[in-house]
Amino acid sequence: MQAKLRVRRYDPEAAEPGPYTQDYQIDVPDHYTVLDALIHVREDEDPSLALRCSCRASICGSCAMTVNDNARLVCKTKLTEVAPNGETVLVEPMNNQRVIKDLVVDLDFFWGKIRAVEPYLQPRDEEPEGEYIAPNESMLNLLTPMGCIMCGACVSACTVLEVDDTFLGPAALAKAYRFVADPRDGEAHQRLSTLNDASGAWDCTRCYQCVQVCPKGVAPMERIMELRDSIMEDGMTNTAGARHVESFAHSVAHTGWLDETMLAVDSWGKFNVPKLMGNAMLGFRTLVRGKLPAPGPFHKKRPGAEKVGRIFKRFEEKQ
C-alpha cells in the first residue's frame, strides 16, 4: 500500500527555529503501523527525522504521539485504521509538553507531576521483615491503575493542562490513587489532603479525553472520581469541589433538577464575595436570555421529584 504521512517537525538548531510540516509518500506493507512507517522514513528516506520508540509492542510507552489530532501509541496504531482509504496521516508530537526536536518531547514536565504525588509505598508501621501480605480483594482494585505504562497520552489529551500547567494531570492522579487505595500504605490521609488542594483532584473537568486515549484502559478520570469520593469520605468537605458535589446532589434530590444559581453560590461559598461578584454579570446575562432556571425559593419542584428523592435515599442507605 501507499502511505502518506504529514509530519510536524521542529529543528532547534535551524537558522530560524519553528514548527513546520513535511510530507512523505512511501510504499509499505498493509500490516504496517504508524511507527513502522515513521521508522521506514527515518531509515530509508530522511535520517534527520527524530522520534522516540523502543519495544514496538505497546509495553514501554515510549512512542506516544498525536495522530490525526488524537494521542496514541503509534506502535499499535495501524495505518489502515487511521487512513482506510489512503488519506494523509497527520503525525505530531504530544501536546502539553515542550518539543525537543520533531516528534520528541521533553518528559521532565510529565515526570515532575508523577514525582509530586510521591509514587511509592509509605508503610504505616515499621517495615516488616518478611513479605507484606495484602488481601487479594484489596489488590484486585489496583490492577487497573497498576497497568499504566507511563506513556503520557492522557497528559497530551488533557484539556485542563492546555490552560493550567499547575494541574497535576491525569497520569499523576491515577498514580496517586494507586497508593491511596493500597492497604499497605499508611499515608492515605496526608495524600488525600494534598490532592484536595488547588490543582489537585478537583480541577479535572471530566472531559473523558484521558479515558478515550489511554492504551491500557486505566481510565484516569475514573480514578480521579474515586479520589474525590475518598477525599469526601475522609471528612474533607470544605472545598469548592466538595461543596459543588453536595449542592448538586441536594438540589436534584429535593427538586428533581439542578438549581444552577445556588450550585455556583454553594460551590464558591455564600460569603466569598469576590468570587460571587466576579460571576454575577455572567449569571445575570444568562438569566436574562432565559438560559438559567429561577434560583433559590423560585426553583420549583419537577413532577416526579419525590421519586428522584427516593432513589437518592435508597442509594444513601446502601452506603
Residue ranges and their predicted role:
Residues 1-24:
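Eukaryote-biased recognition of intrinsically disordered, low-complexity regulatory segments
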Residues 71-84:
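Structured interaction patches on ligand/partner-binding surfaces of diverse proteins
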Residues 50, 55-64, 249-254:
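Short, structured protein-protein interaction patches enriched in aromatics and acidic/basic residues
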Residues 22-33:
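Short, contiguous acidic and Ser/Thr-rich linear segments
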Residues 6-8, 27, 76, 90-94:
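Residues in well-ordered beta-strands of folded domains
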Residues 27, 67-70:
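Short strand-turn-strand beta-turns centered on an Asx-Gly dipeptide
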Residues 32-47, 89-319:
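Ferredoxin-type iron-sulfur electron-transfer modules in oxidoreductases and energy-metabolism complexes
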